[in-house]
Amino acid sequence: MWPESAESPAPLRTGLTTGTCATACCVAAAQALFADQQAASVSVTLPKGKVVDLPIIEYQTIDAGMKTSTIKDAGDDPDATHGATLFVELRLSPEQGVRFRAAQGVGIVTRTGLLLDVGEPAINPVPRKMMTEHLKGFAQTYHYQGGFDVSVGVINGEQIAQKTMNPRLGILGGLSILGTTGIVRPFSCAAYIASIHQGIDVARANGLTHIAATTGNASEDAIKSHYQLDDMALIEMGDFVGAVLKHIKKVEQADFAKLNSSTQLQTLSICGGFGKISKLAQHHMDLNSRASSIDLGALAKLAASLGADNALQERMTKANTSVEALSFAISDGLPLADAICQQALDFARQYIPAHIALEVWAIDRKGQFVGKALDADNSKRDEP
């Protein structure tokens, strides 16, 4: 079994990535082919050297090879692939090397900007390296001079992929085989954050100069309609605004250092519900309720700077929600949402290079814009 997470007083189980599962299937298939053993479980060495055991639920002889399957266990992480059946069809080949293919339920890359070339199966570099190293170990042990054809698949993967960012990223036909450490940390949301980074990379690589990062469906619909943006320009960041800001800073500054302006962004729009934007205005980079809360007193203080009297400030401080506090301010004719958007913009601005025009938009629960802040000067300066 794999270890429990130490971050929680009541330990949460860590899980294993799809890349680790695929590697286990490779190990099981190779063991069956070379040693004529069909073990109930196999051991896999993770990138940092830790060894984990995974159960193998199926062995099936195929032409020139073996098919093996395992069940993806994400531990206590809310992972879309948790419980999915992942399989590998491993075939021996007279041609040396290891070649990867997408079987049923694994996607194909159709857009530039990802870690893989267009036309490649969506099996990321670290899982490829893990599988290759384990297979080379078998080849060395058994003095095998040939190569391997590895087809990785996921039962119902095409349907599961609709719950992920893959279609928007241009990974079509199924899931991606992922992993960098081999382990899924509960609620680390590493895969989701990686998809945010990939969305930004794909948009930039395909020449888009304006992207919009949104907290949910309503904010996405609002900003998409306002600017008539292409789906590729829409980054569903959820609560992870920090992932957007930090990644844009990183990649844009890297291109600036290379004097490469061909992929640089010109405009970033951040759009979300008033409560989420209020958290950003209060310097929170994770907008989830478990990680941050709204300071109603700070909202009231901001309203005071706009002319709110003591009675209104007290009502706002005692409001049930930030949206209710906003409604009190609106009733008094105060542009609180615009002011919140401006505070959020001022905070986000420190992460976003100066050549990018920054916007922050807030919507109400009906998906209507209630506030906005735009860069006062959209002329681009010379340095990020």
Curated annotation (Swiss-Prot):
It catalyses: Co-precorrin-5B + S-adenosyl-L-methionine = Co-precorrin-6A + S-adenosyl-L-homocysteine. One of its GO terms (biological process) is methylation. Its EC number is 2.1.1.195. Pathway: Cofactor biosynthesis; adenosylcobalamin biosynthesis; cob(II)yrinate a,c-diamide from sirohydrochlorin (anaerobic route): step 6/10. Pfam families: CbiD. Keywords: Cobalamin biosynthesis, Methyltransferase, S-adenosyl-L-methionine, Transferase. SUPFAM superfamilies: CbiD-like (SSF111342). GO terms for molecular function: cobalt-precorrin-5B C1-methyltransferase activity. InterPro entries: CbiD (IPR002748), CbiD_sf (IPR036074). PANTHER family: COBALT-PRECORRIN-5B C(1)-METHYLTRANSFERASE. Belongs to the CbiD family. This is Cobalt-precorrin-5B C(1)-methyltransferase. The gene is cbiD.
